[in-house]
């Protein structure tokens, strides 16, 4: 059964697509969202991946990890990174807000492979339009690799708002296909895009898996304060303020900001690039870069809020979910193609290569585990760390 929206009305109880009053026809309950302030909806993270052959001179930058090196006309901090990242080395420039992850763990140095991922922080994304940012990323890629080609991107979309906070029963009322749901109360340690944050009160919720689509809901004020970035974010949140200091739609320094964040893995972006098509020409969009995909981010925002459904009662969306799905647009200086594109994900079928080979692999894998007396828990965690885990998971989904 398709989930429906409650009736949107104005103060005179006339139906309107922009009303902030929501009427539940079964319970006769009216929800007033007039005091909800949409502060910003932005791209919080970009990860651009590249394939190519690592230039010979690049590896010398990592001879002494932890030192400052010259690269592409700028000063960078070189170092090693954990195997969990999938890469061996990094070049980081905190002033630019850019990290280059170099040398894929699962590809040989002398071979062409997925050897580069560039991670971009919010303040760097904010400084450049998508085209200019893409030019900068491609510039760095050309200095790291030869035979370079773009290998898709990953994006995080973040909505910051005031006048709303998650209900206590959020987890129970959030419906989604994802198996993973976490309620992080405390708050404990959370891994953010470019840093680790530990802070001590509030709540944070995370739904979905890192290898697919994730929904995060958390207190952005607390998180920004914990990493000493509150001044930066308050400047961002004030951008929509009017000249009237008493305007109720202005950012309120006395009220916490909550963030609703959708995180799209690069494999999911690839599914959209292969399965989505232009309504006029019928051609698939076939993008492989952040700049090319930027006009489609409104479509991803709407898609995510239909995949993760916050319900008021069975069959009906919570009013806040309708509001942020229909009224919010991603703040980017590009023309949105959301009304000109049909968004679909093209999944690999389980017939043929991936299906047959997954089943054969798992059969042999289990036999080897039994022979070597490896416990089920240890084996499962090792399997989840493997790059082919998303293929196995999707096959049995």
Each PLM stretch: what is its role?
Residues 1-343, 356-397:
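Structured, helix-rich domain cores that form ligand/interaction pockets
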């Amino acid at each position: 059964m398709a989930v429906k929206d409650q009736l949107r009305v104005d103060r005179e109880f006339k139906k309107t697509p922009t009303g902030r009053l929501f009427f539940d026809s079964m319970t006769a309950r009216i929800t007033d969202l007039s005091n909800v302030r949409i502060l910003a909806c932005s791209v919080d993270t970009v990860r651009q991946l590249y394939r190519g052959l690592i230039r010979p001179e690049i590896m010398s930058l990592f001879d002494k990890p932890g030192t400052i090196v010259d690269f592409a006309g700028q000063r960078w901090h070189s170092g090693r990174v954990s195997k969990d990242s999938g890469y061996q080395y990094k070049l980081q420039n905190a002033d630019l807000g850019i990290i280059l992850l170099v040398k894929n763990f699962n590809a040989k140095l002398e071979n062409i492979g997925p050897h580069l991922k560039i991670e971009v922080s919010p303040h760097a994304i904010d400084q450049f339009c998508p085209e200019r940012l893409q030019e900068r990323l491609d510039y760095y890629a050309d200095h790291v690799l030869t035979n370079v080609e773009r290998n898709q991107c990953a994006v995080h979309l973040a909505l910051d708002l005031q006048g709303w906070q998650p209900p206590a029963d959020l987890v129970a009322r959030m419906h989604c296909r994802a198996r993973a749901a976490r309620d992080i109360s405390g708050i404990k340690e959370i891994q953010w895009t470019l840093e680790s944050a530990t802070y001590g009160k509030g709540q944070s919720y995370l739904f979905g898996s890192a290898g697919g689509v994730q929904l995060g809901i958390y207190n952005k004020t607390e998180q920004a304060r914990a990493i000493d970035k509150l001044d930066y974010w308050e400047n961002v949140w004030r951008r929509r303020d009017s000249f009237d200091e008493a305007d109720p739609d202005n950012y309120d320094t006395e009220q916490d900001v909550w963030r609703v964040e959708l995180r799209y893995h690069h494999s999911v972006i690839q599914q959209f690039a292969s399965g989505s098509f232009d309504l006029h020409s019928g051609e698939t969009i076939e993008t492989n870069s952040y700049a090319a995909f930027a006009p489609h981010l409104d479509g991803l925002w709407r898609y995510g809020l239909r995949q993760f459904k916050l319900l008021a009662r069975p069959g009906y969306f919570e009013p806040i979910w309708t509001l942020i799905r229909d009224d919010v647009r991603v703040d980017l200086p590009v023309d949105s193609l959301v009304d000109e594109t049909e968004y679909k994900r093209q999944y690999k079928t389980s017939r043929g290569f991936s299906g047959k080979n997954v089943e054969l692999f798992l059969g042999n894998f289990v036999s080897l585990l039994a022979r070597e007396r490896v416990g089920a828990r240890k084996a499962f965690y090792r399997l989840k760390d493997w790059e082919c885990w998303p293929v196995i998971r999707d096959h049995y989904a």
